[in-house]
Curated annotation (Swiss-Prot):
Highest taxon in the source lineage: Bacteria
Identification of the protein by name: Thymidine kinase
Enzyme Commission (EC) number: 2.7.1.21
Taxonomic source organism: Rhizobium meliloti (strain 1021)
Quaternary structure (record): Homotetramer.
UniProt-annotated catalytic positions: E90 (proton acceptor)
One GO CC term on file: cytosol
Catalytic activity: thymidine + ATP = dTMP + ADP + H(+)
Subcellular location: Cytoplasm
Single Gene Ontology BP annotation: thymidine metabolic process
UniProt similarity note: Belongs to the thymidine kinase family.
Keywords in alphabetical order: ATP-binding, Cytoplasm, DNA synthesis, Kinase, Metal-binding, Nucleotide-binding, Transferase, Zinc
GO molecular function, one term: zinc ion binding
Amino acid sequence: MSKLYFSYATMNAGKSTLLLQAAYNYQERGMRVVMLIAAFDDRAGQGRIASRIGLESEAIPFRAEDDLHGLIERLNGDGSGEIACVFVDEAQFLGEDQVWQLARVADRLGIPVMAYGLRTDFQGKLFPGSMALLAIADELREVRTICHCGRKATMVVRLDGRGKVMREGAQVDVGGNEKYVSYCRRHWDDRMREG
């Protein structure tokens, strides 16, 4: 039986690197993979997944209204060979129904799905996609990174253009190292309490 996997972490833990490495392992053996990324996440260019260490690959951009089960079912029957695995980067941006659609890809199409994403936002709240994945994924995998103090980083702080901590704002604001810093819970709390 195929499974739905969710590998989660805070920012800068290497989630995209792990995704690209796992996809490469399939491709190196001549297996077909499908990589997905949210259409509005164009930091590496439209329809591209990139890691901070320089690895990158093309991906299919998805929108909130897209039926991912239908997409994978069509691609699997397009004559280009069976899909061996589906990879989703920035999985926190999935909608709850899209997570269920990916579960059906694993359950009904027999294709494993590996989703990688953030668990929580800059306010310590779950993203809807992450919440659904934490609830229904067959396997959960924590990807670890460290705070400046050496402890495990589990939280992220969002910074404004002047480097000041933001406590309010939209949950989704795509950015990289210049906008987000990962901390352990204690140091996240310290930063969020700064005057």
